[in-house]
UniProtKB/Swiss-Prot annotation:
Molecular functions (GO terms): cysteine-type peptidase activity; ubiquitin-like protein peptidase activity
Entry EC no(s): 3.4.22.-
Listed name of the protein: Probable Ufm1-specific protease
Active-site residue list: C472, D596, H598
GO biological process, one term: proteolysis
Family recorded in the similarity comment: Belongs to the peptidase C78 family.
Length: 645
């Protein structure tokens, strides 16, 4: 039962509710789920087709938003008349919902309307009880939830279905214009088959584990219930209490691994794979002979075969019956995607078809996955693809200076094996993000500014290569390049010492005899290699003494806030990787988060942290010992994040 507006609570799960707080008139769609309590805002999308163009907006959101989520309201950044702005947002949200339903029946549901005062930044929430009322009711309270990802994924799972289709159809050679109608008829025939009694849906877990894996569940088209309201479907308390296989819940295929880390993102959520098969050979009550029908063409005809690669992702609560998850989430998602592909292909039906590929992403700040179609006829760096990604960044409120929706960023929905480790190209295990979980810095009133994203820890003696005493800067460079790889700025492999040396020879910085030597390199050489291999520019800071480094803590903090890249520190014959600073602006007290490439042991996180090979270092420790030597010159290499999407 939906609560009255006087007692209603708006729950905000998304971390970033305002995508463009300084742009009056901006309209955002509030996204919720029929499976969550009423008025729960999971995410928000910016309206990018202005006036707005509801048809274009609905086309985009139908492709972008997984089934299991829906538009529950709107938010406008407006003036001081909060209720007036909120009413405009409600009216727009209701119109969008009608377009998304494509003429289907919509209940006169309560809609959330919100307005943000552009001057103060205050957000006011209201509830619209009915489409026919012009009065809004203020909500009782607004709660901004912590650990919202945990709430989403501990109680829910993803259903993934891939379905490649080769769709042949004929059209009269004398009437090419009829091809569009014939193609549409072929699409409709496929959609009809999804609900046929002889269609079989096989559901199986999409994640391997060391323990037992549940057996796949077979669901037949004749057993599915279509058209049910997802929010009113009876939930199931436990798979163990269900004897009818048709009423098994999604939790039956979810892994209850108590030793696994907390599930707080789509990447490590439980996933169920759905396969679609046709079972035309089901046992018949009477025997019969095979029959073939022949329909001669009345005139010359042409054959077209269209390749359609469907790939849908949906969200379901774990206590939802699998039968309803397939019939009310997966199948409608397949139908919507077929229609979306049809719209794109129709203008090119008689020429070269666009090579469409569907990818799923879970960008930072968005709690749930989103889906996008890319044309592979165009390379990722071509302007048409860049413009597509820019619009997606704008809609989702993502920064426009980093690649978050490239193909390399896509979710990997293949079968995962938790026992496998990250392996580098030479077969040795590389540790990632070793600074996570280390003790605090000891700067009592400090503000920590640290690296953004992930990196791999490179250090002495890895890969069986003895670089002890001379390879620390090479290892720091490898860590930096691994950061650019893991943030998907590049796909090149992390170079070996020899490849780094060869690069410096190729640009004319070193003689050919340098290749294979044990000579040191410094910040200047690292900047040359980053420019040559990645096209990355660098800023270099020079210090006459290590005692000067604490004076630049504020500037270093700004680097980590704005650029977020690892910094190489070179002093004397030693090199380190700087991952962050903790700085108290009042007292000037500071600490440096150092990743030390001089470590020579095994890939043991506990040993590395306990040995101080990754940790916070004060410029002068409690015993009066200086970490940065006063009698040595220091150079800091600050790689600049490329401005790209």
């Amino acid at each position: 039962m939906v609560p009255s507006s006087e007692t209603a609570t708006v729950r905000v799960l998304c971390q970033k509710l305002l995508l463009s707080p300084n742009h009056p008139g901006t309209l955002q769609w509030l996204i919720g789920s029929p499976f969550f309590p009423p008025f729960t805002v999971v995410s928000t999308f910016r309206c990018i087709h202005h006036s707005p163009d509801f048809q274009q907006e609905s086309d985009d959101l139908r492709k972008l938003l997984p089934k299991g989520f829906e538009v529950i309201g709107g938010l406008i950044i407006g003036d001081s008349d909060a209720e007036k702005s909120a009413f405009e947002a409600v009216r727009a949200a209701r119109r969008l919902r009608k377009h998304l339903s494509e003429g289907g029946e919509l209940d006169d549901e309560k809609i959330v309307g919100a307005s943000c005062d552009v001057g103060t930044g205050t957000i006011h929430f209201f509830i619209s009880k009915s489409e026919n009322t012009t009065k809004l009711e203020p909500v009782g309270s607004v709660v901004y939830e912590d650990k919202s990802g945990k709430y989403l994924w501990e109680n829910g799972c993803l259903l993934h279905c891939e379905l490649p289709i080769k769709l042949p159809f004929y059209y009269p050679a004398s009437s090419p214009s009829d091809s569009k109608e014939k193609f549409s008829d072929a699409i409709d025939a496929v959609i009809t088959q999804f609900k046929e009694p002889y269609v079989v849906y096989i559901a199986e877990t999409l994640k391997k584990a060391s323990g037992g894996v549940p057996k796949p569940v077979v669901l037949r088209g004749k057993d599915l219930g279509f058209g049910a309201d997802a929010s009113n479907i009876n939930r199931l308390p436990s798979a163990d209490q269900v004897s009818d296989i048709k009423m098994l819940s999604c939790s039956h295929l979810c892994l209850n691994n108590k030793t696994a880390p907390a599930v707080n993102s789509a990447e490590n959520a439980d996933k169920i794979h759905i396969s679609v098969l046709l079972n035309r050979s089901e046992k018949l009550p009477t025997s019969g002979a095979p029959v073939a029908e022949y329909f001669p063409a009345m005139e010359e005809a042409r054959l077209i075969v269209v390749d359609l690669n469907l790939d849908v992702l949906t969200y379901a609560p774990k206590d939802l019956p699998l039968m309803h998850a397939v019939s009310n989430l997966v199948i409608p998602a397949l139908v919507d995607q077929l229609y979306s592909l049809k719209k794109i292909i129709l203008p090119h039906l008689l020429v070269e078809h666009p090579q469409l590929r569907i990818y799923h992403f879970n960008p930072p700040g968005v709690l749930h996955p989103i889906t996008s179609m890319y044309e592979l006829n165009y390379g990722e760096t071509e302007m048409k693809q860049v413009d597509v990604r820019k619009l997606l960044h704008l809609r989702l409120g993502l920064p426009l200076d980093r690649p978050l929706l490239r193909i390399a960023n896509a979710l990997d929905l293949s079968v995962n094996d938790d026992s496998k480790s990250n392996m580098n190209r030479r077969g040795s295990t590389l540790l990632k993000d070793v600074h996570i979980g280390i003790p605090s810095s000891g700067v009592s009133e400090g503000v920590a500014s640290i690296i953004q994203g992930s990196y791999e820890y490179y250090h002495y003696l890895q890969d069986g290569f003895d670089d002890s005493g001379w390879g620390c800067a090479y290892r720091s460079l490898q860590t930096i390049i691994s950061w650019f790889r893991l943030q998907h700025y590049t796909s090149i492999s992390v170079p070996s010492h020899r490849e780094i040396q060869q690069t410096l020879v190729e640009i004319g910085d070193k003689d050919p005899s340098f290749v294979g030597s044990r000579e040191w390199i410094g910040a200047i050489e690292l900047s040359f290699v980053l420019d040559k291999l990645l096209g990355v520019s660098c800023k270099i800071m020079n210090f006459r003494s290590g005692s000067e480094l604490p004076e630049k803590c504020r500037e270093l903090a700004m680097h980590f806030e704005n650029q977020g890249t690892p910094i190489m520190i070179g002093g004397g014959v030693l090199a380190y990787t700087l991952l962050g600073v903790d700085y108290d602006e009042g007292s000037g007290d500071c600490a440096f988060l150092i990743l030390d490439p001089h470590y020579t042991g095994s890939e043991d996180h506990k040993k590395i942290v306990n040995g101080g090979w990754c940790g916070w270092k004060k410029a002068v420790d409690s015993k009066g010992k200086s970490f940065f030597l006063h009698n040595k010159f220091y150079n800091l290499l600050l790689p600049q994040r490329p401005n790209m999407v």
